[in-house]
């Protein structure tokens, strides 16, 4: 399916969250014969410690008081099951938070390799 990466280093301040959610839903509803658009949201950090959160399957994996992380989670596509590790029925989100540049490269490679090789 078509893939769109939204890469940011901070919080959106020019429109309300409701508009961001609405636009992301419209984008995710677009489709080709290969399936619906996959919308990835990537929040970059200057910290290259490898502590980024990649492909979370629940908001509990994010900081409880981080509105930006929760918003990106809600805006992101569910990864197709073929991309998700075979460890249950959890649906990973197409997002990362506080990611380094090296983690971004791993995410971009998702269509080429199994998620098991990334995580």
Locations of regions flagged by a protein language model:
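Acidic, low-complexity intrinsically disordered regions
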Residues: 1-119
């Amino acid at each position: 399916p078509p893939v769109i990466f939204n890469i940011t280093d901070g919080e959106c301040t020019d429109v309300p969250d409701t508009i961001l959610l609405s636009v992301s839903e419209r984008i995710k509803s677009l489709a080709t014969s290969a399936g619906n658009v996959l919308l990835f949201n990537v929040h970059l950090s200057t910290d290259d410690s490898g502590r980024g959160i990649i492909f979370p399957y629940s908001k509990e994996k994010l900081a409880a008081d981080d509105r930006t992380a929760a918003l990106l989670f809600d805006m992101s596509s569910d990864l197709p099951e073929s991309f998700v590790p075979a460890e249950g029925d959890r649906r990973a989100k197409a997002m990362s938070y506080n990611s380094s540049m090296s983690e971004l490269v791993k995410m971009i490679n998702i269509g080429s390799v199994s998620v098991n090789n990334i995580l």
